[in-house]
Amino acid sequence: MVISDKQTLRRCVKQAVRRAAVVETLLNFDAARGEMGIKALTTSISKAQGLTPLQADAAAAFAAMDALEMPIEDIPRAALIQSGYTREAYLREILDQMRAKRVFACVSIRDAQSAVFEDDRIAPLLTLPEDFFAPGRYGVEYARRAEEIHLAAQQCGARDVLIRQFDEDALRFCLIPVCEDERLRLHVRLDTCAQADGFLRQLDASHTVRALAFGDETVEPMLIEAAATRRRLLVRANKRIPLALEKLGLRFVPYASEADLPEQMLGRWITAREAIWPALCDAYLPLARCGYPLTSEAIARDVQALLGGHFLMDDDNTHEAYQE
């Protein structure tokens, strides 16, 4: 169906976003042993003296409960209903409601040997603790750290590794080389433009490493500009979605929950998608107005690519990239 008016466009894009399978690139949760459930979800947002909960994550928590058909007005009853699920079945229900295609759950390098996942949609994101590159008496033994990353990736089957705290020397002498040798994709958080500049220099010096970079709203514009000319760089742009659409088309990641609980992940996705589809509508509208033959089928393909298709395509092609 060719779309010719704004209302049809809005309806089509909204429907496509809500129906699409999504890839979650950062879940801060121990999928094997971490505590989850309604009690854990509502601990920080419980009503105080009957007042309306306005905490930052309240909407996401209650959106998750609604999606899971848990009674929002009766938390004890909701917890009782949830207790009737096995852990595996409850996690599966969350992923089903989210329409999750893949969820990258953090696995500490120190727990890699015992990492086990109860659903094949969950993939390990090997995570380095903040003190991993802390210097000892004789400095940092980068070769030893690289060997630890290599061993941990083999133990848990990880193809992705995350560094939360930028360290240019660690990138140069350990992470970039080990990602080249072990064919790992590097996830990196960048808190300043200076860090982004240092990271881009390291990425450009390598000919094979693929990376997913992300930062706060002040860093996103620089990363978006950088990704426009770097095929091996994907950017996660949660706040600057219109700019990313303008500069990168659909080749970026518009969302990550960074949630501590699976239910929180579900709720944050439900709220995040309500910001994604209007931005997509605004990007499509000029095309529709100038007579471009925009169809609902094309929009569905676009949305699927945006919400994880590009990320998984890069994942599947990583090994090919090392042969280039």
What are these regions (language model features)?
Residues 188:
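Metal-dependent catalytic cores of enzymes that make or break cyclic nucleotides
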Residues 199-202:
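Membrane-embedded translocation segments of transport machinery
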